[in-house]
Amino acid sequence: MSKTRKIIHIDMDYFFAQVEEKANPSLKDKPFAVGGTNPKRGVISTCNYIAREYGVRSAMPTAIAMQKCPNLILLNTDFAKYKATSAVIRDIFYSFTDKVEPLSLDEAYLDVTDVKEYKNSATLIAQAIKQEIFNKTGLTGSAGVAPNKLLAKIASDINKPNGLYVITPEQVDSFVKDLPVKKLFGVGKVSQEKLKNMNVETCLDLQQLSLATLVDKFGKFGSSLYNYARGIDNREVNPVRIRKSVSVENTYLEDLKTLEACLEKLPNLYNKLTSRMTEEHYKSIIGIVVKFTDTKFNKTSLTRVAKTLDKKVLKNLIIELHQKQNYHIRLIGIGIKLGEIDDRQLSLVF
């Protein structure tokens, strides 16, 4: 029997608008939208939830949006800002697992089946990811947890905004029965209308049709529909990036005022780091990194070229870094660099 997969789908809430809201808090209590600033030919990219209460939606022509909400504030898109925020969020994903499949700037699938931390609980991992995103960006996202990509994506939309919805393997059958077929991956307006003409509106309706009938009516997609109606989706999470580093860090409630206090934290950090490392990571080490953040949020780091994870090297880096940054330390991070990068890149803060 194959191992039950644990898939998380993270979808940031009204991402472009939320980034703008964070940059300009005065927008928080006002209806506004991003994109579509040309009132005649523009199309809304996204909007905040206040604007949605007026009926404004993504991909809506600006002229219609303004009719629904005359006080709607329109902002130009700032993709540089969105990409920078997205990069921070994506790095958070990779700190939990290598198996990340980004779908866009604001959403991704993560396969956490083999993640040992958080008691190997996908629910606890999803909670931790959401919290880490909020801690580092001030933004909220919604998470869906399920045994496959199809259901994880559907689940992430259920408790928006800032939601978390879990579908366990035991709940799959009961969950899909009442699920509208329009929620299924690949079912657009044409397919939905075609299914409606066949008296199919829910997955339970769809389950009554044979595989042969669905293939006859929908071709190759008919096989997918047959499986999706039963909550079956064998699509893998396809990573698109080779991981360049693995790191862990701890923020401490009390300042670390001495070198000895910093060194005392090394064993726990080392254990956390090794628990995240795979056999391939050990084979690919090209550098070791230590970083500090002090109580004034000053950040410093040191990197050493190395082919193995050596506690002595980590200890020496902590000693050297402490001499350079003689302040009370609030955060310590340690990590490894992976793959083929040049010496100049090794000096970068991780």
UniProtKB/Swiss-Prot annotation:
EC top class, as a word: transferase
One Gene Ontology MF term: DNA-directed DNA polymerase activity
Domain named UmuC: residues: 7-188
InterPro entries the record matches: DNA/RNA_pol_sf, DNA_pol_Y-fam_lit_finger_sf, DNA_pol_Y-fam_little_finger, DNA_polymerase-Y, DNApol_IV, IMS_HHH_1, Rev_trsase/Diguanyl_cyclase, UmuC
Site, as annotated: Substrate discrimination: 16
Reactions mediated catalytically: DNA(n) + a 2'-deoxyribonucleoside 5'-triphosphate = DNA(n+1) + diphosphate
Cofactor binding description: Binds 2 magnesium ions per subunit.
Origin: domain of life: Bacteria
Localization, UniProt: Cytoplasm
Keywords: Cytoplasm, DNA damage, DNA repair, DNA replication, DNA-binding, DNA-directed DNA polymerase, Magnesium, Metal-binding, Mutator protein, Nucleotidyltransferase, Transferase
Subunit structure as annotated in this protein's UniProt entry: Monomer.
HAMAP family, per the entry: DNApol_IV (MF_01113)
NCBIfam families assigned to the protein according to its UniProt record, in alphabetical order: PRK02406.1 (NF002677)
Biological role: Poorly processive, error-prone DNA polymerase involved in untargeted mutagenesis. Copies undamaged DNA at stalled replication forks, which arise in vivo from mismatched or misaligned primer ends. These misaligned primers can be extended by PolIV. Exhibits no 3'-5' exonuclease (proofreading) activity. May be involved in translesional synthesis, in conjunction with the beta clamp from PolIII.
Record's protein name: DNA polymerase IV
Organism: Francisella philomiragia subsp. philomiragia (strain ATCC 25017 / CCUG 19701 / FSC 153 / O#319-036)
